[in-house]
Design a protein with these regions (language model features):
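Conserved P-loop small GTPase signature centered on TRAFAC-class small GTPases
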Residues: 1-26, 30-34, 53-60, 114-209
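Switch II (G3) loop of P-loop NTPases
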Residues: 61-75
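Generic structural signal for well-ordered alpha-helices
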Residues: 104-108
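Inter-motif core of Ras-like GTPase G domains
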Residues: 75-97, 103, 113
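Residue-level signature of catalytic and energy-coupling elements of molecular machines
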Residues: 28, 67, 89, 103, ...
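Conserved Walker B
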Residues: 69, 94-95, 128
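Short acidic active-site motifs
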Residues: 73-77, 99, 140, 163
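Post-Walker A helix-loop "phosphate-sensing" segment adjacent to the P-loop in P-loop NTPases
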Residues: 34-42
Length: 209
């Protein structure tokens, strides 16, 4: 990202979940959002749009999360969902090699439509509890994440060893922290002057004893 991307205060975050059909995107989101539908076998046909409020450093933010369809025929539609995305979660199934290979196709689509340098990537390998069925080596997934400069998490939508919720919350908090660290200094000075002026007005408006 360049400095021109940090000229306004961050109030909301658009996050998109991408991945092949059946990798568990919806189940992961339902667990994170506390939705009771974990065992739903149906695939996402269009998209699901969720919203969640989070607090960081005493400030409130709105996170908009888009759960996208994973079927191959919908891949050209995904460009609509990734517009203005700040965080992209790439989800694959540790027991399905094709779902891991499909990430290259998704990254190609992403590169064709948005600037990769303007988003934070997150890689989630799902169904990590099915060790005897793994078709992807953990070291290969980690290497892929390193190439993307992405955060990496091994998850089971039903029994994560590490809290999935803490991981996803941490992703959003890290993005907010990164954004705020890069805010335009002129904006910070203007806000500081405005806040000082407001305090002076309140002080001057107090009745004299």
């Amino acid at each position: 990202m360049n400095n021109n991307d940090y000229t306004i205060r961050l109030k909301s975050i658009r996050a998109v979940f991408l991945g092949l059909d059946g990798v568990g995107k919806t189940s992961i989101l339902e667990k994170y959002l506390g939705i009771e539908n974990i065992d739903d076998p149906y695939s996402t046909i269009l998209s699901n749009d969720y919203s969640k409020k989070i607090k960081f450093d005493d400030l409130d933010y709105t996170v908009r999360i888009i759960d996208t369809p994973g079927r191959e025929r919908f891949i050209n539609v995904l460009r609509v969902y990734i517009r203005n995305a700040r965080i992209i979660f790439l989800v694959f199934d540790m027991t399905r090699k094709e779902s891991f290979l499909h990430l290259d196709r998704l990254l190609e689509m992403i590169s064709e439509n948005i600037n990769n340098n303007k988003v934070m990537f997150v890689l989630i390998g799902n169904k990590a509890d099915l060790l005897d069925k793994f078709e992807i080596k953990e070291k290969d997934a980690k290497k892929f994440a390193e190439i993307l400069n992405a955060k990496f998490f091994l998850s089971s939508a039903k029994n994560s060893a590490i809290s999935l919720n803490e991981f996803i919350d941490g992703v959003f908090q890290d993005y907010i922290k990164l954004y705020n660290e890069r805010l335009d200094p002129d904006l910070l000075r203007r806000e500081e002057n405005i806040n000082l002026e407001r305090r002076n007005r309140r002080r001057n408006a107090r009745p004299l004893c």
